[in-house]
Amino acid sequence: MASYHQQQGGSTFMAIPTINFQMYSEIAGDDEWWEYIPCPFCYIEVEVHFLCDHLQEEHCFDMKNAVCPICADNLDKDTDEHFRVQHSHLLKRRKSSSFSCKPSSAAADKGSYEEDSYFEAPSHCMGRPAPDSSPDPLLSQFICCSLAPPVDSPRRSEADAEGHGSSSSDDQKRREQGVMDDASKEELEERLQRIEFVKQMLMTTIAY
């Protein structure tokens, strides 16, 4: 609304707009309440008037000639009214937003919280929960494991020691094998000499 004031020294009137703060506060103070109901399949809170769309899109639920997924009763034409009346104990009401001309600190915190809930509401309506910014404990464990320093040096030293031990044992086996080969050669030579000696003895006896 506007109020008119007369200037000094003249008859000209100038319209100066004024605001009816009482009316503005009454309009701004009217909060809109939204009704939510948990989905019977995925338990995500969905607005009542979006529940049918959510069931059809997310869970392929045929609303035509279907029964209520909660109470198994036949659904009427007004499915929203059915959920509001028959399952009122499942409904949750939330404020959409609030506004005041000079908000205090508590009112400011409340307004910011309700504003966040207002922006998160579409994700609930579409059946997709708002993303959680808290880190996943499983991922944090993997990250900590990847950043941790390697502790393979003792294992490597043990493996090297085992390798040296195996190589030394192989050398010892080769030496023993060589000694055995030398002994077998000596035995073979002795046998050949004995055979040759026996042949000579036989030849001499035959000659006489």
Swiss-Prot record:
Region Disordered: start-end pairs: 151-190
Skewed-composition ranges (Basic and acidic residues): 153-163, 170-190
InterPro entries with a match to the protein in the record: DI19 (IPR033347), Di19_C (IPR027935), Di19_Zn-bd (IPR008598)
Pfam families: Di19_C (PF14571), zf-Di19 (PF05605)
Signal sequence segment: none
UniProt superkingdom: Eukaryota
Family as reported in the entry's similarity comment: Belongs to the Di19 family.
Full protein name: Protein DEHYDRATION-INDUCED 19 homolog 6
The organism of origin for this protein: Oryza sativa subsp. japonica (Rice)
Phylogenetic placement of the source organism: Eukaryota, Viridiplantae, Streptophyta, Embryophyta, Tracheophyta
Gene designation: DI19-6
